[in-house]
From Swiss-Prot:
Homodimer; disulfide-linked. Interacts with the C1GALT1C1 chaperone; required for galactosyltransferase activity. InterPro entries: C1GALT1/C1GALT1_chp1 (IPR026050), Fringe-like_glycosylTrfase (IPR003378). This is Glycoprotein-N-acetylgalactosamine 3-beta-galactosyltransferase 1. Disulfide bonds join 91-115, 232-246, 300-301. Belongs to the glycosyltransferase 31 family. Beta3-Gal-T subfamily. The keyword Manganese applies. It comes from Mus musculus (Mouse). Its EC number is 2.4.1.122. It is an enzyme of class 2 (transferase). It holds the Pfam family Fringe. The gene is C1galt1. UDP binds at residues 94, 138-140, 146, 169, 309-310. Primarily expressed in endothelial, hematopoietic and epithelial cells during development.
Amino acid sequence: MASKSWLNFLVFLCGSAIGFFLCSQLLSILLREEAAIQPNMLHNDPHARHSDDNGHSHLKGQMNFNADSSQHKDENIDVAENLYQKVKILCWVMTSPQNLEKKAKHVKATWAQRCNKVLFMSSEENQDFPTVGLKTKEGREQLYWKTIKAFQYVHDHYLEDADWFMKADDDTYVIVDNLRWLLSKYNPEQPIYFGRRFKPYVKQGYMSGGAGYVLSKEALRRFVNAFKTEKCTHSSSIEDLALGRCMEIINVEAGDSRDTIGKETFHPFVPEHHLIKGYLPKTFWYWNYNYYPPIEGPGCCSDIAVSFHYVDGTTMYELEYLVYHLRPYGYLYRYQPALPENILKEINQVNRKEDTKIKLGNP
């Protein structure tokens, strides 16, 4: 009897050890898969858009890639300058007191310089940075409150200073010049907004908060007025989804932000997550959320991409260099989408000499 009990005990121990080993191996595989996506993301929550700061102790201060412009003094930027005047964009960046030095200052040193006007929105005012104090609390549950108050502030103080109003996070990188091309085809008095379009929960879809989204002037008017008339309320702490529901209620169209050949321009992750096949497992929420069929690999992203998300300070400068400085010698751009005729005509009037005439458009 004693030997049988001892045998049962040994079987139990062996079974427990094997079970523990298999569970630990499975957990390790799952954790590695999650870490491969983004170590600092809340992976199972498509609306968790702010990553934790990685420290980046080597990044002591902000850099200015445009300080030494001697290499680019003869660069022809007539088109970009004309669009800067014709398509005026106010950018507001959602940040927090603890992220001014870790994140927001790198946005300020890079892409934000190309907005016609930029504002940093925080829970507290900081006159040195500076930030607009929205007098809210911090935390994920406050994101929609901050968004509502930020758009109200922009509407009350800067409505006539821009045509379009872009919201971005402090870990979003935006190629503002490409955004201007996208918006140049539209009238800011049209009730419409653009971003990375997701499909669940809202009939017309809604725009991913992390990839950023941009409202027309009329969309901004309607959004602010909807809270005055109580057509919309603070119905959820999930900022992008709640804003999307409000937009549908007030008949603001969810626009198609893809380029002329159907490639996406707004991206909710860093480039590598979209460009490398298999980086995002098929069980990941992303594949079920896209309004348009998503593509992975080199075909994922437009040549005139507008935004990427979860971009840390170091990567901000890497993207700034790759987008605005690195050039392959001897190549002309293969994909040059057309400009609206009225803008193209004005540019060519400025460039009267035949050798400097700008020819833009698909062949």
